[in-house]
Amino acid sequence: MAAAKGKKGAKAPSTKKSDYYKVEGNSVTRTKKACPKCGAGVFMAEHLNRYACGKCGFLEYKKNEKTEEQE
């Protein structure tokens, strides 16, 4: 008989979905930007100069105010 496999590495902690929404009175608003390709249920990661979707890889660059003022 085959030996039983041991336990693999620990799982990464899951994200708290409640951090992505803000409740004010009776209204709920999203705090992060949604991916335009994947839809409203997929949030984009906010980096220094861009937004990135972890599901489809869509990138959207932020507009840099410093470069626009210089031109």
UniProtKB/Swiss-Prot annotation:
Q: Which Gene3D superfamilies does the entry mention? A: 6.20.50.180
Cofactor annotation comment: Binds 1 zinc ion per subunit.
Q: Which UniProt keywords apply?
A: Metal-binding, Ribonucleoprotein, Ribosomal protein, Zinc, Zinc-finger
Fetch the Pfam families from UniProt. Ribosomal_S27 (PF01599)
Sites where the protein binds Zn(2+): C35, C38, C53, C56
Necessary cofactors? Zn(2+)
- Output one GO MF annotation: zinc ion binding
Q: What is this protein called?
A: Small ribosomal subunit protein eS31
Gene name of the encoded protein? rps27ae
